[in-house]
Amino acid sequence: MVKSVIIKLVTPVWMLFLLVACGEPNQSGSSEPSQSDAAETEEQLIARVNTIHHRVITLDTHADINTENFTATRNYTQDLDTQVTLPKMQTGGLDVAWFIVYTGQGPLNSEGYEAAYANAIDKFDAIHRLAEEIAPDQIEIAYTSDDVRRIVAEGKKVAMIGIENAYPIGLNMDRIEDFHTRGGRYMSLAHNGHSQFSDSNTGELDMDYLHGGLSEIGYQAIAEMNRLGIMIDIS
C-alpha cells in the first residue's frame, strides 16, 4: 500500500496492475487478482489508483537540489528543469518532498571535513530560505509527522530534509544534533566512498575496506541518531 503513494501518471499500465494488486486485497481477502480484477479496464484501474493517490499523503523521499535554484530570482516557485518544483508538486499531486543535503566523499582530514560541513550548511540554508523567505505561503518544513499532517491540512506543500553522507559531521558529534535542529530526519553514514563512520559499497569490487563495516565513531553516530530520532539510511 505504501508503494502506491509515489505512483506517477506516466507509470506503465502493467506496473499499475502490480501495485494495486499488491496494495488492496480482493473481496475474498486474498491479494491474488480475481477474475473481476482481471476484467478491470485500463481507465477503471487508473481511476482507482488516482482515488488512492488523492486519499493518502504522497511523498517523494529523495529530491536532489542545486542551491543556485534557491535565490530570489530563480527558485522552486518557477517551473524549472529540475526533479521537483512547487508547480510540479501541485500538478503531480505530491504532498511531501524530501530535499537532500548531499555531500560527495572527500579526504578524511580536517580540511575535508570543514569543506563538507560548509557545503551541507549551504544546502540546509537553501531549503530553509525556500520555506521561510521565498514561498512561506506555499511550503513549510516539517520536523514531525504531526507537522506533516497539519501542513497538508492547511493546503501547503511539505519540505523534509534528508542527509546523504554523514561526512560533513567530521569528528564533531555535536553536529549530528545541529543537523537534527536544522530539520535533518534521515542520514546515511557514507555514500559512494568510505567515510569516517563506515565503509561504502565502493569497496565491494576489490574488497578494499577501511573499517570492516562501521568504525568506532560510526557506532557512536548511530547511538546519537537513535537518541535524536534521525533515521539511518542504509540504501
Please name every model-derived segment.
Residues 10-20:
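Bacterial N-terminal signal peptides
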Residues 22-208:
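N-terminal hydrophobic targeting/anchoring segments and the immediately downstream early-domain regions
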Residues 7, 18, 35-36:
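Short, intrinsically disordered, low-complexity terminal segments
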